[in-house]
Amino acid sequence: MLILASASQSRKKLLENCQIEFFQISSDFDETTIQEKNIFNLALELSFQKANSLSENIQNLSLPEELNHGPLEILGCDSIFEFKGEAYGKPSNKEEAFIRWKKMSGEFGFLHTGHTLIIGNFDSTSKIFKITEIIKKTVSSRVYFSNLEDWEIKSYVDTNEPLYCAGGFALEGIGGKYIEKIEGCFSNVMGLSLPWLRKNLYR
């Protein structure tokens, strides 16, 4: 049974749309404790720590009956947008979101999503989660943005959507109409590479 160690609604929807059975349990890992400067590696390390934090504390959680015995796969993900070598997380306010979009207009950047799948068996009686395998990879997609007028950027920023998304945009939301094209995995830009998950979940 798959556990999504994330509160992300985008990742949840991707799994639901593909009819992948899973439970969503948010990881309580403190992301500020990681100091990795390489953006590619940072996304991977954060994904691992999210999944690992849940695996280490799983015995303290009130799990559904289906998860109390047998094989478990814990999926941790983290997305970071890279623009000209700089990491763009969620904008802290509308002003920052507007400035970013001014820079990104007509340009391209990379959406890196770190993926970690911790595979093991959990026995609720002994409260032991025995890890058998850990699979990790960062998947990167190139995102091209349309040339936008200031009023278009302001209109988008005023929806508040950019404030809740890595990089300040949501491909599956209002921001999708401002994205010219994607090179690489499409679903990766929404926070989870479904081809990567299929390959490693159903081996």
Swiss-Prot record:
Class of enzymatic activity (EC top level): hydrolase
Protein's UniProt name: Nucleoside triphosphate pyrophosphatase
UniProt keyword terms in alphabetical order: Cytoplasm, Hydrolase, Nucleotide metabolism
Keyword Hydrolase attributed: yes
Top-level taxon: Bacteria
Main location: cytoplasm
Catalytic activity entry: a ribonucleoside 5'-triphosphate + H2O = a ribonucleoside 5'-phosphate + diphosphate + H(+); a 2'-deoxyribonucleoside 5'-triphosphate + H2O = a 2'-deoxyribonucleoside 5'-phosphate + diphosphate + H(+)
Active site: 78
Cofactor requirement: a divalent metal cation
Pfam families found in the cross-reference section: Maf
Species: Prochlorococcus marinus (strain MIT 9301)
Subcellular location per the Swiss-Prot or TrEMBL entry: Cytoplasm
Enzyme Commission no: 3.6.1.9
UniProt-listed InterPro entries: ITPase-like_fam, Maf-like
